[in-house]
């Protein structure tokens, strides 16, 4: 499970990461996406990078079709815009029939994991028991979003998220097995499959008769997908391709019968006659012959899931098994990987829910110094912070699933944020649970140490969080950069763009005089949350001011300012989280939910601290010379360590 390798040009490459994720929001031939929980084959580590897309001054002079204004809150916040279409009010997307169907599923699935599945045994055996797999098949768990007419349950993204949450509460090893199968294993068939491909393969995978796996990562390719070496050469007759190569760290690799495989294919340019290699996606069956696998990998966590190397030796793949178009494999891979990021947040929200229950139980029953430890301030703060992190993660997960079900097309930044936030929140919550439980938490019997081992991979799955932070910042800056390019073009023709220039001048004047942007969430958030709403608006203004200043300073060079980009991404994550919880808590207050006042406290607490972080971080980036000194020190210290082969300092005893 390799971490992404960072190269000097990674910033420019990242401008493509996720650019197509939103366009896969609806599955072909069925209602909206199957963004099945991303539970999550190791090969997703790659964050899938494409050839660089640069911000070219020439590009701004070419005629381009008008693009609809994005409804994404995340896109808007980089521009200093308060775009509320996708975040307010907190969406309710299930109709009565869907809600009833979900209720009928939740009970049996929860009981199965409580009464039948044994996560400790799965971990010890390093596999999911056959009886458990059979039970999951009977529940329909292998085809949750496959259309019902093809043997699946045909769930929406929101319905899927709820079941992903239940699985995450109980066993992340099983989650990975299920997710590697349907979230990425056969997801490409759902997104890009022809009618014939769907009819041939989906009934088999939906029933669990055949497991699926996603084969992308190779020893030479981590984040740089273009460096894969597996090849698929078309036969002279054009009826098949001969596939050769190997893939590493493939979840379900030793169990699967159907594989989504990515390989380079030679493609002749019709105009020039030149032959270039481009990535193409294929549906490959083990029964084709020439498909073998290695021994299961020994891993830190998610031991119950099968992870192995897969080899393809002269495999004859029928031409009709090309997935999507020849040469479009990168697009297929990006959409598969990006399509289900929200599912990780839903899964880990469930994991946190279960872990928090263990922490609360221990704090409630443990007596020290003559009192229950839940009465001690240190423990109270830990529990409260754990609850806040779970609330934010869960709110993001269901916001995103609803956005997808509603048919919104632009949510890739939000999806990346949910993955980053959820995976880091789950790690913190589990770590704090162990701390609250003390020595008992470190023991094997309570099962928290297993969850900690399992959770560590989620900061690597789906693209490492480091890579995704760069994507969040660069994608947002790219959208803002286009706006600034438009302003520059307007200055070339001031008489024809009076309105645009007056608006920009007015905005700059308000910022300089401290008047503010005039943005407000008044009338949008519940009145009881007005103070937190004001904090969110102020944070947005501070964030957007720094984004614009840094873009003006660095221009295209911002792609190489990774210290800066990381901190902008952290601000974006905090800000999106503020708005999401404001939306959810507002709905709870408006509807009079029994938990409304508790949710208000969770929301206010998050907003107070997030606003403080944004204010301090943005002020530091904007005007603190010590920040630049710190960045220079990081570069120099790191360089010295690399040159020295490790630490530069010696033991203080000099012995």
Swiss-Prot record:
The modification S-nitrosocysteine is found at residue 237. Its main location: mitochondrion. Pathway: Lipid metabolism; mitochondrial fatty acid beta-oxidation. The keyword Transmembrane does not apply. It is a peripheral membrane protein. CDD domains: VLCAD. It is found in: Mitochondrion inner membrane. Pfam families: ACAD9-ACADV_C, Acyl-CoA_dh_1, Acyl-CoA_dh_M, Acyl-CoA_dh_N. Residues 1-70 are annotated as: Disordered. One of its GO terms (biological process) is epithelial cell differentiation. Residues 1-40 form a transit peptide. FAD binds at residues 214-223, 249-251, 464-466, 562. It comes from the Eukaryota. Homodimer. Homodimerizes after import into the mitochondrion. This is Very long-chain specific acyl-CoA dehydrogenase, mitochondrial. It comes from Rattus norvegicus. The gene is Acadvl.
